[in-house]
């Protein structure tokens, strides 16, 4: 399973970013191997409506699960249509911590 976590920095030791569409980075973690790949947000400086376009990026990368803090309305609708599951993380911890809590079933499912 591939997990995408919105992040303030590159890598699993970076802090989780609460804002979905405005996250500077997206860290994709393979839940089996633990390997990760970080993608910089190409739409970070765009004006409005980036949420659905970010969803397209995440789906293209093959994410089954998204962990983030907050979602806008358009991103929520697009994520629902994509079939990805979305979980809330608001503990100001690292990407690695968010993934661990997801695996333990300790995150609240949003979608």
PLM regions and their residue ranges:
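Short secondary-structure boundary segments
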Residues: 7-9, 69-70, 90-91
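Domain-level signature for proteins that mediate thiol-based redox and metal-cofactor handling
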Residues: 7, 14-17, 65, 80-81, ...
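N-terminal first-folded block
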Residues: 2-43
């Amino acid at each position: 399973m591939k997990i995408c976590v919105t992040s303030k920095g590159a890598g699993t030791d970076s802090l989780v970013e609460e804002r979905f569409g405005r996250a500077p980075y997206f860290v994709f973690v393979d839940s089996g191997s633990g390997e990760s790949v970080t993608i910089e947000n190409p739409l970070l400086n765009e004006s409005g409506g980036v949420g659905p376009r970010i969803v397209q990026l995440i789906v293209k990368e093959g994410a089954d699960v998204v962990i983030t803090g907050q979602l806008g309305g358009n991103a929520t609708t697009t994520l629902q249509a994509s079939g990805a599951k979305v979980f809330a993380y608001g503990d100001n911890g690292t990407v690695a911590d968010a993934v661990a809590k997801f695996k333990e079933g300790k995150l609240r499912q949003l979608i």
